[in-house]
Amino acid sequence: MDNVINDEAIFKYCESNPKDRDCLCIHPEPTIEKIGEDLLLPYYCWYEPCKRKTAKIPTALRDNMKRCNLIDCSVSLGEINLLDGILKVNNDCLSSHAIYAGYSVKPLEQEIHLPIIDPKYLILGLAILALIVLINW
């Protein structure tokens, strides 16, 4: 019974204060929900306001959050450069261990063949040809 009363208080407070940082887990921005759909991962599993200790989270949402199969980590990138198609990331983190991974971008070598006849004229020509065949038949 306490959970119901507590949940009602949470919803009441967050309806009155939807922009409060502690209520953003209940009222996320549409872009956050869209990112969750694109990731195929509910926003409450990774969205920072849902991880806050002071977040106002109702019982049902808290139960759903327990099912999140996700390891949460924060990555902070320092300097990022793109030079001659090579992405260089300098990450000065707390650890002294770094793994170098070189990436390069190579444009596709492909030939583009333009159609001899514009497709709209091709369709028109086929329609006229079908009409001529129909008349002569």
Swiss-Prot record:
- Any GO CC annotation of this UniProt entry: viral envelope
One of its GO biological process terms is:
fusion of virus membrane with host plasma membrane
Its main subcellular localisation, reduced to a broad class, is virion
| Entry annotated with the keyword Cell membrane | no
Q: Which residues cross the membrane?
A: 115-135
Kindly list the places in or outside the cell where this protein is found, as annotated in its UniProt entry: Virion membrane
The organism sits in which domain of life? Viruses
Q: How does this chain sit within the bilayer?
A: Single-pass membrane protein
Give UniProt keywords alphabetically: Fusion of virus membrane with host cell membrane, Fusion of virus membrane with host membrane, Membrane, Signal-anchor, Transmembrane, Transmembrane helix, Viral envelope protein, Viral penetration into host cytoplasm, Virion, Virus entry into host cell
Signal peptide stretch: none
User: Per the record, what ranges lie on the membrane's Virion surface side?
Assistant: 1-114
Q: What does this chain do? A: Envelope protein part of the entry-fusion complex responsible for the virus membrane fusion with host cell membrane during virus entry. Also plays a role in cell-cell fusion (syncytium formation).
Q: Which family does it belong to?
A: Belongs to the poxviridae A16/G9/J5 family.
What is said about its interaction partners and assembly?
A: Part of a stable entry-fusion complex (EFC) which is at least composed of proteins A16, A21, A28, G3, G9, H2, J5, and L5. Formation of the viral membrane is necessary for the assembly of the complex.
Q: What is the protein named?
A: Protein J5 homolog
